[in-house]
């Protein structure tokens, strides 16, 4: 029986690398996988999903799914699922329930203010299985929050969606997110 999976985690938890490795595992077993991302997410270029570790794969846009013939696909994997609309998540449910194709969606649970993204909210509501992809804060505790860093400080105001990658965000535990404590990062990228 096909299921809808939502695998969420803070930034830098290797969600994208995990998604690409799951694709690899399916393909190693001669299974056909469709990789998907919202068109809004374009930092790696159109139709490319790329992890911070350097893994990459081609993809289609979520906005195209409803017009595609999914016959023959064994799995659909969605990256950056927090950016999906309610209608797009409903279509993922259709793929699972009516077409019998498992869907594995990866994304952030909440934004830098601690509020749900729309796509994540609906995935949390409708997924058959919800799994956390873990990473750690600078202090060594589990990071569950995404801090937006502006001028070396944790931002508390601003638009929900500002695409920028690890130069603008740091994963923190809730205690350090609430305190605005970036520890050794001081607003630098994960690579510094």
Language model regions located:
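Conserved ATPase-coupling elements of RecA-like P-loop NTPase cores
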Residues: 81-92, 112-117
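Short recognition patches in nucleic-acid-associated and regulatory proteins
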Residues: 136-162
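Walker B catalytic acidic pair
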Residues: 79-81, 107-108
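Conserved P-loop
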Residues: 1-71, 111-122, 132-135, 154-156, ...
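Short basic (Lys/Arg) and small-residue
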Residues: 127
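Alpha-helical scaffold elements within enzyme catalytic domains, especially in hydrolases
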Residues: 25, 94-95
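Sensor-1/coupling segment of RecA-like P-loop NTPase cores
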Residues: 96-118
């Amino acid at each position: 029986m096909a299921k809808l999976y939502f695998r969420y985690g803070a930034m830098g938890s290797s969600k994208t690398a995990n998604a690409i490795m799951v694709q690899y595992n399916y393909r190693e077993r001669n299974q056909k996988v469709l990789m998907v991302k919202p068109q809004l997410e374009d930092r790696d270029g159109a139709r490319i999903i790329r992890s911070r570790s350097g893994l990459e794969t081609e993809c289609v846009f979520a906005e195209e799914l409803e017009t595609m013939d999914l016959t023959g696909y064994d799995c659909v994997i969605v990256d950056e699922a927090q950016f999906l609309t309610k209608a797009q998540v409903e279509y993922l449910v259709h793929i699972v329930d009516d077409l019998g194709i498992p869907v594995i969606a990866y994304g952030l649970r909440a934004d830098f203010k601690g509020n749900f993204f729309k796509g994540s909210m609906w995935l949390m509501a409708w997924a058959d299985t919800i799994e956390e992809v873990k990473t750690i804060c600078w202090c060594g505790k589990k990071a569950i929050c995404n801090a937006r860093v502006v001028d070396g400080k944790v931002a508390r105001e601003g638009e929900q969606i500002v695409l920028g990658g690890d130069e603008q965000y740091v994963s923190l535990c809730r205690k350090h997110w609430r305190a605005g404590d970036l520890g050794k990062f001081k607003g630098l990228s994960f690579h510094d």
